[in-house]
Regions:
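Ser/Thr/Pro/Gly-rich low-complexity, intrinsically disordered segments
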Residues: 1-6
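Short, conserved active-site entrance elements at the starts or edges of catalytic domains
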Residues: 7-50, 60
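A generic local structural motif
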Residues: 25-28, 51-53, 71-73, 133-135
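Solvent-exposed, well-ordered amphipathic alpha-helical segments
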Residues: 32-34, 54, 59, 111, ...
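Short beta-strand segments
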Residues: 36-70, 84-88, 97-101
Length: 153
């Protein structure tokens, strides 16, 4: 079977450079979290119960950015408390590393949203563009909420 890189005409070295550009490493409190495609974002209910959700994320300026539906449970819980935890995970939410304490907040400034969106586009490429297209067609793009996560050292 021919690997997909051969279909695209990418040599092994070019493919590796392309992968390195997509995965922006941030040397600070994030550690190796940014090497993963998904992270588990745990937020807390008023009762103190933890609710963990796998999400796409991207690092920019030493912080992590996530987008979600504006009426999601994550958004409701973050309006109550900024306390959160993060851990690298797979798409199904199975944790792949250690949990880290974090502080999360909803982002409303358009400049910060643009920066977060650019970081996600750089990391996930065509997948974000395709998601944006479907969100725009269904009207969900305007109802999108952005979350900034600051991981504790």
């Amino acid at each position: 079977m021919v690997p997909p890189s051969a279909w695209l005409g990418l040599s092994g070295r070019r493919q590796a450079r392309r992968r390195e550009r997509r995965i922006v490493s941030t040397v600070n409190a994030l550690g190796d979290l940014d090497r993963y495609r998904y992270m588990c974002l745990a937020t807390f209910r008023r009762s103190g119960a933890e609710v963990a959700t796998p999400v796409w994320f991207a690092a920019s300026g030493g912080k992590l950015y996530v987008f979600t539906a504006g009426d999601s449970g994550k958004v409701k819980r973050l309006r109550h408390t900024a306390r959160a935890r993060v851990a690298p995970s797979d798409a199904r939410g199975r944790v792949q590393g250690a949990w880290r304490g974090a502080t999360a907040r909803l982002v409303t400034e358009s400049q910060m949203i643009e920066r977060a969106h650019a970081a996600l586009r750089a990391k996930y490429g065509w997948q974000v563009l395709l998601g944006d297209l479907f969100s725009r067609l269904t009207g969900r793009l305007r109802r999108r909420a952005w979350i900034e996560v600051e991981v504790e050292p």
